[in-house]
C-alpha cells in the first residue's frame, strides 16, 4: 500500500492535484484550510462530497494544489481528484461513488464565440424595417 496517493481531477479549465495520506481529516487547498479557500458552503460541500459519500471524512489528510478557472470549476476538479484517490485507496468504494456520478469527468466546456455573432449564440439585434 502506497503511503501517499497522488491523483488529478479536471473540470472546465481547472486542474486539481490531490495528495492523500492516512491521517486525521486535515484538508489543505493551495496552502489554505479548505474553509478559507472555499468560503461558499455549497462549493465546499461539492468539493468534499466524495469523502461524505464514502463516510471517510476523518480518515485522510488531504493536500490539494488547484489552478486555473474559477471556484466552481476548481471545486469540481477537487471533487473528481478526491474521488479517484479514494478508489485508488479502496476499490470497494467504486460502486458507491459511481452511483453518485463522482467518478465521471464532466465534459461540458465553454462554447466558443462565433464570428458574425456577439457571443457563442447571441446574435446582434435584427431590425426587419
Curated annotation (Swiss-Prot):
PROSITE patterns in the record: RIBOSOMAL_S9 (PS00360)
Residues in coiled coil: none
Compositional bias annotation for Basic residues: 114-129
UniProt entry tagged with the keyword Ribonucleoprotein: yes
Gene3D superfamilies (alphabetical): 3.30.230.10
GO BP: translation
A single GO molecular function term of this UniProt record: RNA binding
A Pfam family assignment: Ribosomal_S9
Any one annotated GO CC term: cytoplasm
Region named Disordered: 110-129
Keywords associated with the record: Ribonucleoprotein, Ribosomal protein
Family per record: Belongs to the universal ribosomal protein uS9 family.
NCBIfam families in the record: PRK00132.1
The protein, known as: Small ribosomal subunit protein uS9
Organism the protein comes from: Chlorobaculum parvum (strain DSM 263 / NCIMB 8327)
